[in-house]
Amino acid sequence: NYRKFLNCLNYLKVNETLIPDEFLNISFYPDPYLYDWKIEKGEKIGIISYKSLFLANEIEVNEKLNLQLRRCGLSPKTLFISTLKDHIIQKKLIEIFKKEDIKLIITTTSFSSSQIKNNELIENSTNIFTSLKIPILQLLSSNRSRKNWLNSSIGMNSSDLLMQIIIPEFDGRITTCPSAFKEIISKKNTLYSEITSYKADQVG
């Protein structure tokens, strides 16, 4: 949708003509959105990612993950969601994963879906990570480049450590090694900014 918006601006700037209908049609994606589901053999693995990444076409990590799981004889079931704080979305995820008999969850989402009051967890039957009673792996995506990661002696920086390890542990998620790094894909002088994208790491 954002790409269509930019195309509209280009038409107005250059031609000042009517914008083609193809750029005016807005796509709608349900929440959660099922992505790249196939009928295939193998144990089913649930994958949860933010829908904002899908809308920004930031899906290389998900595609590489699906590919590797299929090479291992597994069946990935990817869902893009807006948030895990919404109990309605969590309920939908639980229904889908129970119906599909998901054996393991891999999530790229940050924060925590658990509610905390007075430093204690509040029991919630609709919490996806506690009600399904299956292992949950936290896939780590570093906000630094792989080169900076390798040259650093501290490992995860403070923001990655907080958002992807410390807070998600409230959900009982199992921490993994970094599977993606934020790399510069182009530099635009007109934007005065570097354009970055998460790139899947073959080792992770």
Identify the residue ranges that each predicted region occupies.
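An N-terminal assembly and electron-transfer interface module characteristic of large anaerobic redox
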Residues: 1-204
